[in-house]
Amino acid sequence: SVGFKAGVKEYKLTYYTPEYEVKDTDILAAFRVTPQPGVPPEEAGAAVAAESSTGTWTTVWTDGLTSLDRYKGRCYHIEPVLGEEDQYICYVAYPLDLFEEGSVTNMFTSIVGNVFGFKALRALRLEDLRIPIAYVKTFEGPPHGIQVERDKLNKYGRPLLGCTIKPKLGLSAKNYGRAVYECLRGGLDFTKDDENVNSQPFMRWRDRFLFCAEAIYKAQAETGEIKGHYLNATAGTCEEMMKRAVCARELGVPIVMHDYLTGGFTANTSLAHYCRDNGLLLHIHRAMHAVIDRQKNHGMHFRVLAKALRMSGGDHIHAGTVVGKLEGERDITLGFVDLLRDDFIEKDRSRGIYFTQDWVSMPGVLPVASGGIHVWHMPALTEIFGDDSVLQFGGGTLGHPWGNAPGAVANRVALEACVQARNEGRDLAREGNEIIREASKWSPELAAACEVWKAIKFEFDAVDNL
């Protein structure tokens, strides 16, 4: 007779362990689970733990050749979600041995790779991860981080200003470089390739890189400030991506860019290592994130994607605005902004932070606010995001009635006015409009911008509320 009992047994008998004491080395996950009708939450939570670790749908005799107790994921706590029927937060602990060191790719393949199509679940969302110190230390993280970036750029005590060059597609390389020059000359710190500017027939990447480098050097010479343009190195193959990054380094520019979700974590981590070794800053765009993070009950919350990016490596990442055209609830946005920038973040459910996270001195990432913002938003942005951020105005620069350079001037004046007002102890939330109006009295460029955008609002209810 065989030495094990074949057949299908309930997951919860093996994988639901409410008495388990989590270890400091465990990776912890908080899943929002919506079971199918008739499936008890313990079984659903245990199924998630099983299918994302050692389990399969039936008992297999090779289980006897290893120690399941050592390697299995465990659902150790379940709580109902307030105000939602049939939704539960299931906490799962994974032993660290299940994961390859320094690989975000492997971490996600394990934790979210298979389990989201599971039939016993109606929907599943990964809300947060706790990355243990032992695992954090296997990653190099951001190529440089916030402090080193400020030192490289010699810019302190204020947010940095950016602008995405529009129209995003269709300009020739020379006209593109001209727009870059005008924005940098007017007072911005950075300009940006749009996420889908790679190497298209109307503008091949090398032509763009050369004209943008020329624009950067010309603007630096005329302003005495260090300037940058996020040259998008994203490409169809990793080899081609690295070729573009090498070209950027040879041109002596300070920063390149990558679309980390469409490009993939493996490519991103390779690029981050190259940037660290060669003194390039790395700007990260999150194109495709809403496919993954928009639904409340299914997918992955952006805070998980943000944590993963900090591990994989990037110096800037787009993080919503709280005030513009793209979604973002204030407290929740600030929660993952802190996860990107700070060294130690306390658990705080009101901000969507399910676990205390210690980054043990891994460099921080600058959050980038962009999407439908303009000069009237400047006081709110300065107050919400603080100094360690990049504020990016695409249309809010290039849409200025007098042209690109005056648009840049308007944003720089508005920013400097807000920072000065804050440093003098004024309340940006209450006096914001007043501060902008005062500044516009001596800056005709700002006055013109204020007039154009005085009535623009993108007001919809946020999708993501706790």
Swiss-Prot record:
Residues carrying N6,N6,N6-trimethyllysine: 5
Keywords from the UniProt entry: Calvin cycle, Carbon dioxide fixation, Chloroplast, Disulfide bond, Lyase, Magnesium, Metal-binding, Methylation, Monooxygenase, Oxidoreductase, Photorespiration, Photosynthesis, Plastid
Enzyme class: lyase
Known EC number: 4.1.1.39
Catalytic activity: 2 (2R)-3-phosphoglycerate + 2 H(+) = D-ribulose 1,5-bisphosphate + CO2 + H2O; D-ribulose 1,5-bisphosphate + O2 = 2-phosphoglycolate + (2R)-3-phosphoglycerate + 2 H(+)
Gene Ontology BP terms: photorespiration; reductive pentose-phosphate cycle
GO molecular function per UniProt: magnesium ion binding; monooxygenase activity; ribulose-bisphosphate carboxylase activity
Cofactor note: Binds 1 Mg(2+) ion per subunit.
Binding, substrate: 114, 164, 168, 286, 318, 370
Residue positions binding Mg(2+): 192, 194-195
Miscellaneous field: The basic functional RuBisCO is composed of a large chain homodimer in a 'head-to-tail' conformation. In form I RuBisCO this homodimer is arranged in a barrel-like tetramer with the small subunits forming a tetrameric 'cap' on each end of the 'barrel'.
Family recorded in the similarity comment: Belongs to the RuBisCO large chain family. Type I subfamily.
Subunit structure: Heterohexadecamer of 8 large chains and 8 small chains; disulfide-linked. The disulfide link is formed within the large subunit homodimers.
Task of the protein: RuBisCO catalyzes two reactions: the carboxylation of D-ribulose 1,5-bisphosphate, the primary event in carbon dioxide fixation, as well as the oxidative fragmentation of the pentose substrate in the photorespiration process. Both reactions occur simultaneously and in competition at the same active site.
PANTHER family membership: RIBULOSE BISPHOSPHATE CARBOXYLASE (PTHR42704), RIBULOSE BISPHOSPHATE CARBOXYLASE LARGE CHAIN (PTHR42704:SF16)
Name by which UniProt lists this protein: Ribulose bisphosphate carboxylase large chain
Organism whose genome encodes this protein: Thespesia populnea
